[in-house]
From Swiss-Prot:
Function field: May play a role in locomotion and behavior.
GO-annotated cellular components: cytoplasm; striated muscle dense body
InterPro entries named among the record's database cross-references: DUF842_euk (IPR008560)
The protein's name in its UniProt record: FAM161 homolog famh-136
Family assignment from sequence similarity: Belongs to the FAM136 family.
Keywords for this protein: Cytoplasm
Localization terms from the record: Cytoplasm
Amino acid sequence: MSNSTMEATQMKVKLAVDEMIDDLDKTYLRDMQKSMFQCSARCCDNKKTTRDAVENCVESCNDGMKKAQGYLEKELGGLQDQLSRCAMTCYDKLVQQFGPDVNKYSESQKLSFNEKLDSCVSVCADDHIKLIPAIKKRFAKNT
């Protein structure tokens, strides 16, 4: 894959994921974080409680945010894994078409191989960007 095409494809996916994270942050995570901080502050209101009790209370306040962040990390990791597998499938199909020894390709074969790989990986990226709305829905459902 040519560097400029690969970078453009990576940037397209990155921008789509960043946009999703920004949307989730504004729609869900900020309110969760605000509640977490308010809850944590309330844990410190009782001056008669033990330090351990305060720490346990604060930890309990953090549970929802930790769960949400863990869920989002799991979803994004799954998306990345699927995208990587798709790109590897593109590569494998082209190796089957052109032959296993890339070093034996003629210049025109290398050019054709790279163009087809660029195109296939770009389709992978587009297909996986289309999965982002479903990830957002699952996140909303699970937080």
